[in-house]
Regions:
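ABC ATPase NBD coupling module
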Residues: 68-82
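Conserved ABC ATPase signature
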Residues: 135-139
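Conserved ABC transporter NBD signature motif
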Residues: 57-68
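Catalytic Walker B motif of ABC-type/P-loop ATPase nucleotide-binding domains
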Residues: 160-163
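Conserved ABC ATPase "signature" region
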Residues: 113-131
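Conserved catalytic motifs of ABC-family nucleotide-binding domains
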Residues: 156
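H-loop/switch region of ABC-family ATPase nucleotide-binding domains
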Residues: 196-197
Length: 231
């Protein structure tokens, strides 16, 4: 097990959002976290990267490759735990596509020659050479979300977290994005954890599904088993 959550409780603004979550995710798995609005799926996803944990009362423990996540440096978390947000505009911080690809590597102090190599590799892999020098504000929603994904993958993460990444895309862009995630998972062997409203969005790709309701884990489904956890 490479990511383990033990008895996670989170309280925000006096409301208990997560109520004793226990979960274990194996390396290289593709896991879907499914639940309606208010189920706690996005809050759970954010617990897996300390810089994104919302301010509030929290208890429990998360292990990342056997280490308490609180003890894993921000440098390591920035490089090895990638996150793609629901809103394509939320993540973009620069005005040019090429700079957006380079920004994360610059922030961790990578030498410029290595940055150029990595950026060129990812631009080619994602097929964005034709808009490499464009302004980010001229991109479509699908292009922005693809750029966000490429900007995460240029860091060579071990874990990729996605918070409803296709909910604001049109059906064609959403299908293309999901196909790209599937390709990344298959070719790079990264661990993928995606929060979504509907099982339909991820059913064709996932190894395991975690179902949530009202801050609790209510069931887990894999290809070979279904386990229900009564309240």
């Amino acid at each position: 097990m490479k990511l383990t959550a033990s008895d996670i409780h989170v309280e925000l603004g006096g409301n208990e959002i997560l109520k004793g979550i226990d979960a274990a995710i194996k390396e290289k798995e593709f896991v879907g976290i499914i639940g309606p609005n208010g189920s706690g799926k996005s809050t759970l996803l954010r617990q897996l990267k300390t810089s994104l944990q919302p301010v509030g009362q929290r208890s429990g423990r998360i292990l990342y490759y056997g280490r308490d996540l609180e003890e894993v440096s921000q440098y390591t978390q920035s490089a090895k735990i990638g996150f793609v947000f629901q809103n394509p505009d939320t993540q973009i911080v620069t005005d040019k596509v090429w700079h957006e690809l380079a920004f994360g590597l610059e922030s961790i102090g990578m030498p410029q020659d290595m940055i150029r190599v990595r950026v060129a590799e990812m631009a080619s892999y994602f097929g964005i050479q034709n808009w490499f020098y464009q302004s980010t504000d001229t991109l479509s929603g699908g292009q922005k979300q693809l750029l966000n994904l490429a900007s995460v993958m240029v860091m060579h993460p071990k874990v990729l977290l996605l918070d409803e990444p296709v909910s604001q895309l049109d059906p064609i862009a959403a299908a293309d994005f999901m196909a790209t995630i599937h390709k990344l998972h298959a070719e790079f062997g990264i661990t993928v954890i995606m929060a979504e409203h509907s099982l339909e969005e991820v059913a064709a790709y996932v190894d395991e599904v975690i179902f949530m309701k009202e801050g609790r884990l209510i069931a887990v489904r894999t290809h070979t088993r279904f386990v229900y956890f009564p309240a």
